[in-house]
């Protein structure tokens, strides 16, 4: 991140916006290309493109609820997004890994929030499976960035914990 305070934490927010745009563009491409549950084999026996709508949360949690979950999960995403923006704003310049992690989670959360509020469901298009016997639930770029961001967040916590222990010695 640049040392200039003129732009502050803007680069991290721009990363979040870039993730949001990439997520939205890919979802639009697959919605325009595939019909529901159609599969295009990418890596035979392991990876397909597909189109699925998820009205629930991760792994279709509460997808069969009466519709209230749309606004419940949207409210959670809004609260989480506000917390992440505030957290990003309070970071010190040297906390680059943490900033990238938070920006990725924020971008992904905003991508799925858009779907949930505007469309009433989240658009998923990535399908990982093992020879059509075992299937991981379909997901999208937003989910991918949320996951990578969470992993980076955990790595940053371990790194920070190690640094704190070394400083104490």
Curated annotation (Swiss-Prot):
Keywords for the protein's UniProt record, in alphabetical order: Aspartyl protease, Cell inner membrane, Cell membrane, Hydrolase, Membrane, Protease, Transmembrane, Transmembrane helix
Keyword hit for Thylakoid: no
Pathway(s) where this gene product acts: Protein modification; lipoprotein biosynthesis (signal peptide cleavage)
A molecular function GO annotation: aspartic-type endopeptidase activity
Primary site of residence: membrane
Annotated TM spans: 1-21, 68-88, 94-114, 135-155
Protein name, entry field: Lipoprotein signal peptidase
Organism: Ectopseudomonas mendocina (strain ymp) (Pseudomonas mendocina)
């Amino acid at each position: 991140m640049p040392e200039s305070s003129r732009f502050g934490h803007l680069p991290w927010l721009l990363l979040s916006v870039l993730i949001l745009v990439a997520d939205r563009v890919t979802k639009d491409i697959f919605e325009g290309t595939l019909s529901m549950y159609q599969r295009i084999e990418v890596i035979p026996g392991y990876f397909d493109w597909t189109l699925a709508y998820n009205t629930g949360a991760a792994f279709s949690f509460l997808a069969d609820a009466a519709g209230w979950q749309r606004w419940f999960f949207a409210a959670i995403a809004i609260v989480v997004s506000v917390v992440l923006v505030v957290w990003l704003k309070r970071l010190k310049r040297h906390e680059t890994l943490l900033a990238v992690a938070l920006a990725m989670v924020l971008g992904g959360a905003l991508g799925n929030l858009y779907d949930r509020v505007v469309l009433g469901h989240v658009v998923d298009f990535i399908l990982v499976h093992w020879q059509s016997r075992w299937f991981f639930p379909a997901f999208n770029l937003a989910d991918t960035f949320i996951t990578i961001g969470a992993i980076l967040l955990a790595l940053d916590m371990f790194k920070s914990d190690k640094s704190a222990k070394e400083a104490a010695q």
